[in-house]
Amino acid sequence: MYFYFIQKRLKHTSAVLCFLILVAAAVSCTNAERPKREPMTILIESKSTKTTIPIEVEPAVTAQEQERGFMNRKEIPDGTGMIFVFKRDQKLRFWMKDTPHPLSIAFIDSTGRIREIYDMQPFSLDIIASTYSVRYALEVAQGYFERAGINAGNKLSTESLERLKAIAQ
């Protein structure tokens, strides 16, 4: 009888242990950092300078990538940025929580047109919201848009827009 009790208890303990291992594995997979997406170059056609300006961007497509953004980045070189890609047009809202570098943000509609540009201050919890429904947001080091001659009304190149649409799928 005692042996039967021990055997039954071992089966129960084994089942509980297996369950806990599965839960731990699931949690570790969920919390694991995804590998960074490959940077890509987008082209912006500037009306004022009549040139095409390349910007090397990190795409932020998933909710986790978008939430992290440029948090805790101390340097963002000119000519680089992060493009936030959404599946549908919407009014977007950004803040600078845990972001030590001043940024400028361009809100871009589904046709690739830059609708508006704003500056954002380090660590600010103030919300920067798009006035229009847009599909993309491009963050760069503060002042870069002005230095490069990029303004509201400029457009992404057709090729850049097609590549962004493809990664949104």
Predicted regions and their residues:
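C-terminal motif of bacterial Sec signal peptides marking the signal peptidase cleavage site
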Residues: 25-28
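Bacterial N-terminal signal peptides that target proteins for export
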Residues: 3-17
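Compact, glycine-rich, soluble single-domain proteins
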Residues: 30-169
